[in-house]
Amino acid sequence: VGPLFLREAGAGRSLLEPVLRTARARTAVGALPFVLNLIARDQATTDRWAIAEATYQEAIGLARESGQRTELTFGLAGLAWLQARRGREQECRGCAAEALRLSAELGMGLHEIWATAALGELELGLGAAAGAAGHFERLQRLLADHGITDVDLSPGADLVDAYLRLGRHDAAQRVAAQFVAAAVAKGQPWSLARAFRCQGLLADSERGFAEAFEQAVVQHALTPDSFEAARTRLAYGGRLRRARNRVLAREQLRAAAEVFERLDARPWADRAHAELAATGETRRLRDPSSLGGLTPQELQIAVLLTGGKTTREAAAALFLSPKTVEYHLRHVYQKLGIHSRDELALLLAAQGVPAGDRPGT
């Protein structure tokens, strides 16, 4: 399962989903939180954020009920990180605080690292660069203390972003040089893309930043992390706008805004729209049929039912009564303005939750 944390998850994904199906079929409550947390981590590092939240919530709930404090810490740290990217400040801080407390009690260094990363990403998304830099600097120290050197876990790219917003160009250059060297040494696309983004942010000419960002876009295309790809396009579009190349800037910024809207990454979507407005483009209305209005349990029920399970089977998988499942399904229909499971399946697919990727199907 290590690749799930190092952005090399393809093989692990195919192994975990059959395990989850077996655990559900056997009502193996003790095994479910661990498997659910791993699947949620994979979902959160791709573009399946809505179902990732539901999966984390289920893992957290089962871990609390069964007294599995290690898995509870895992789920809380993971959910904090996801909520950070969505700009859900209260939820993120609450999950991170509990995860940090449990990490200290249990000696879970990895989860402390993850919760700290969540707080840094929250501050960065909210525009609090100084707070973000403080958390990322602490994260660097934690990684060093635990002997963790893999560049995929490094906050280097985010720290460069924070330092530049603070006007600390020398510090940004120093961190970027270290991060780029580590990314090149590993040679994997996810970190290479972020390394090229750092170079694009720091380049002192239009040709220089364009070449760096274009290389970043190429590397992003080799990974499933659409959020990081959108961040690169946002940075690229911002530099193009400041270079007075409004036409090309709008192309990058529209692409970034579309991804942030689809993921419900509100602070980042707002920033992309602000950049677009600075080019003279009017903001488009948000699609009311997004999944953001569903509760995690409603979404979990939706994906199970559209994945082929009957109401009774979905109820058994989630330890609910069939009547409760039907009650939640009615609310799903009302919130989304639809009337059938076929419409629901189409909407889920349009929002990036294809049936083959859904846990438990």
Where are these regions (language model features)?
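Hydrophobic/aromatic side-chain positions at a characteristic register within alpha-helices
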Residues: 4, 24, 44, 64, ...
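Tandem amphipathic alpha-helical repeat scaffolds
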Residues: 1-11, 31-48, 71-87, 111-126, ...
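Helix-turn-helix DNA-binding segment
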Residues: 277, 283-361
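N-terminal regulatory/sensing modules of transcriptional regulators
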Residues: 9-10, 57, 97, 124-126, ...
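Amphipathic alpha-helical segments of tetratricopeptide repeats
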Residues: 17-28, 57-68, 97-108, 137-148, ...
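TPR-repeat structural position
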Residues: 9, 29, 49, 69, ...
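Generic long, charged, amphipathic alpha-helical segments
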Residues: 176-235, 279-291
